[in-house]
Every structure is written in structure tokens, then in C-alpha cells.
Amino acid sequence: MRRLLVPSSALLWGLQLAFLSPALALILVNLYGATTTEVGWVLGIYNAGGFVAALLLPAYADKKHNYLGPMLVCGALTLLLAVVLASVTSLPIATIALVVIGGPAGVGSSLLFAHLRHGGASAVDIVNTRAIVSVAWVAGPPLATFIIGWFGNRAILLAIAAVAVLNITTTAVMITYRNADVRAAAADGTQPASPAATAEESPVGRLGIVLIMGAFILLQATNATAMTIMTVYVTETLHLDVQWAGIALGVAAALEVPALILIGRLSGRHSHLGLIATSCVAGIAFYLGLAFVTGPVLLIGLQVLNAWSFAGIAGIGLPLFQQMIPRPGLSTGLYMNTRRVGSIVSGPIIAFGSLTALGQRGIFLTCAGLTLTGLVIIAIARRTTKPARGDRLPATT
């Protein structure tokens, strides 16, 4: 049972996000009468709150060297958020709830990965756990739309509450096992080993950290751009049925899981920055292919490149940040925030790219150029890596 706790927790946190993220706009419109403009503002404020929470809560956990306790609080806040959103009818109150309650509640998955790193988990373990989160994202959005379609908008809030209860239970059991280990160590007169994650010296200098963070913001932005514009691009530029956009995104999500597992295995033998460089090359090829694709067969085939590109960003990126920044909570929070900032940057990418003579195809050419820029930045950052330490994580727990 104990071995199933971390995978179960990863699946539940993934389901929570996969249920809420695609359904939130519908909830705001149908339950609170929000206009499109209001939805944009609310989501922006909500993401800003999440950005701050992703820094403060993990930093507090670092200070206490305790990640499961705050993770339990995040589960309780998720349950409270679902209850509040189902009860209120005012958009301003719902917005306040999303910022004050939803922001911290969304940090739970970050704390799980920080807990793993604090306990000395290997890069392979972390990437495999991240693959489980991707499994949740394969099933979560379709299941969420099914629940809303058959049972109404408030039903998805009930589903989120149910997931939160399971999350609370799983985390409580993890805390019980941890406390039992501490008591057993005290009874034997032994001291728990110092967490490797907090004892390591960063193999990357401050300049390297800044460069890699900048590169990841670009990579996250291009990935978010492709996901955001795919449906519109397929229908308006390729003149295909909208179902092909859904098929393409579904195939990409399904391929992410084996890609993450494969890149996790490779991380034990190859440089992390080198693997990320291969994902950048795949991303450049993917965006160039999208810019010139004309039919559904190539559109679907290109998702293999998309999956490998994402595996580098999501799979290797997380343990790389945890290695660069010895504090597990802060490093994980900063990594998660590169996605939030990247999502913000994706808006200008879409606006700028669509103004070119190529129309929407120009968006993907812009993405290819930005990914190439990210690759160059990573190559420069690699030169700042300390030769004595390398740029990969230990392969053992």
C-alpha cells in the first residue's frame, strides 16, 4: 500500500487540475454570468494569485522542512473552494475565492514533487511521477466535459470536492507513515539522514539559473501557444473539422506518457541540458511542420515531435530546477511559475505572429524562432555549469 501512495497522490492532484482548468471558464459564464472580458480578467487575477502562492507556500515548507503538512492544507482548501464556488452566485465573491482559496490550493502538486526531492528521490522517480500527472490530463478534460454535459456545471464542482477528499485521505496516510518512520528512528537512537536535495551545492551559477529560467519561459510560452491556438488554426486555416484538433491534442497527450518515461530513463545516463536541447530541436521541427501542414495525416504525425518536446520541458525541466536550486519547495515553485509566465507571454505571441503575411501560420514560425532562441540560451547556460559536478542528478535515491 505504501508504494502506491505517491502515484495515487500524483494522479489525484493531476485530476484536480485537469477537472478545474478546462471547466473554469464555463463555470464563470454559466454560474455567475461572466462576459468574455470578465472571464479574461478573472482568470488573469486567479493566475496572479497562484503565482504568488507558488512562491510563498513552498518557501514556508522549505523553512519547516515539511511538505506533507502544507500539502494536506492544499487538499482542504480545494474542498473548501469547491463548496464556496457551488454556493455563491456573485462573480466578485467567486473571484475572491479563486484568489484567496484557489491560489494556495493549486500548489499541492508542487509540494508533492518538493517532498519527493526532499526525500532524495532520483530524477527517474520524479519524471515517472510527472508521467502519472500526464495520465490524469489525458482522462481529466474529457471526463470533466462529460460530467458537465450530463449533470450540469455544479456537478464538476462536486467531482472536484470528491477528488479533494481522496487527496486529503492519501496525504494523511503519507503523514502517518512519515511520523511512524520518525518514531522508529528515535526509538533506535538513529538520526534521519540529511536530505540530499538540501545538502547539494548548485552545479549552475546564478547567471546560469537566470538564463535557464528565461529559456524555460520561452519554451513554456511556445507550448502554451500551440495548445491555445490549435482549435482555431485547424478550423480557420486548415479548414478541417474541429474534431481533428481534438484528435491532435488527444494523440499528443497520449504520447506524452511514454515520452516522459523514456526521457526519465535516459536522464540517468545523459546530461539533463543535453536532453532538453533534443526536445528544443523536436519543438522547432514541430512548429515548422505546423506552419506548413495542409492535411490531417501530417497534423497527427507531428504530435510525436510535440510529445518529445513537452517531455523535455515537463519531465527533465522539473528535476533540473530542483538540482539548480537546492531548496526543493522554492525550486519546484519557480519551475511551475515558468508555465504561468509562459501562458501570459503566449498572448503576445499569438497577436504578433498572426499579423505577419502568413496569418496564423506565422504564429508557429514565431514559436519556432523563440524555441531556437531558447535552445541558444540553454547552450550558453551549459557553459556556466561547474565541470566537477556535471549537470545531471544522481541516479539513485
At which residue positions do the language-model features occur?
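Helix-loop boundary and gating motifs at the non-cytosolic
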Residues: 1-47, 215, 223-234, 245
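Hydrophobic core of transmembrane alpha-helices in multi-pass small-molecule transporters
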Residues: 11, 92-108, 217, 298-312
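A membrane-interface helix-boundary motif in multi-pass transporters
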Residues: 35, 146-164, 352-371
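Helix-to-loop junctions at the C-terminal end of transmembrane segments
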Residues: 53-66, 148, 259-271, 354-355
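Structural signature of the two symmetry-related core transmembrane helices
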Residues: 69-83, 274-289
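Cytoplasmic helix-loop-helix junction between adjacent transmembrane helices
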Residues: 99-133
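Intracellular juxtamembrane helix-capping segments at the cytosolic ends
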Residues: 106-120, 311-326
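A late C-terminal transmembrane helix in Major Facilitator Superfamily
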Residues: 326-356
